[in-house]
Regions:
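A generic, well-ordered mixed alpha/beta core segment in the N-terminal half of proteins
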Residues: 95-98, 104-110
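Structural signal for beta-propeller blades
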Residues: 53-55, 94-96, 141
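Short loop/turn segments that connect beta-strands within beta-propeller blades
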Residues: 59-62, 100-103
Length: 151
């Protein structure tokens, strides 16, 4: 069943659309939102506002939106690990980092084979706890990334 909130550009997708799903806009004050990660234990969602170099937080209990972290190293993709910590791909930091429960940032990976990462973009945490991420070169050329040349 097609709902007015969704525009299906390919009729074949209709079989995947659930009739009981609706869209809800949570916030409009970002320039470019990406990388949502949900924390079920805390009932909140975080996402990146990449050009504004901040992570935003939406509280499911009261609907409020606040800044979760700033600066955020122009973080992009996120995931939550098995211990409930935020894993993030940082364009400016050229690394994959983790925000600890006390708020401190730990760099998990910033190089491979002796070369700096380019522009980590998306990340998932596998059920065994291993972290998989993409590292394309295109983000390194954007204005808000590290000024260091591509490795």
């Amino acid at each position: 069943m097609r709902q007015p909130e969704f525009e299906l550009l390919d009729a074949r997708f209709a079989r995947y659309a659930m009739g009981n799903v609706h869209l809800e806009r949570l916030y409009t004050g970002c320039r470019w939102s990406e990388g949502p990660a949900y924390f079920p234990a805390g009932r909140y969602l975080v996402w990146s506002d990449i050009p504004n170099d901040r992570l935003m937080r939406w509280d499911e209990t009261d609907g409020s939106v606040s800044v979760f972290q700033q600066p955020a190293w122009n973080a992009n993709g996120h995931a939550v690990d098995r211990q409930g910590r935020l894993i993030g791909c940082e364009h400016r930091g050229r690394c994959v980092s983790r925000i600890e429960h006390d708020g401190h940032r730990t760099v998990l990976a910033d190089a491979f084979d002796g070369r700096r990462l380019n522009s980590p973009n998306d990340v998932v945490v596998k059920s065994d706890g291993s972290i998989w991420f993409t590292d394309p070169t295109y983000g390194i050329c954007l204005l808000y990334t590290s000024p260091s040349p591509r490795d």
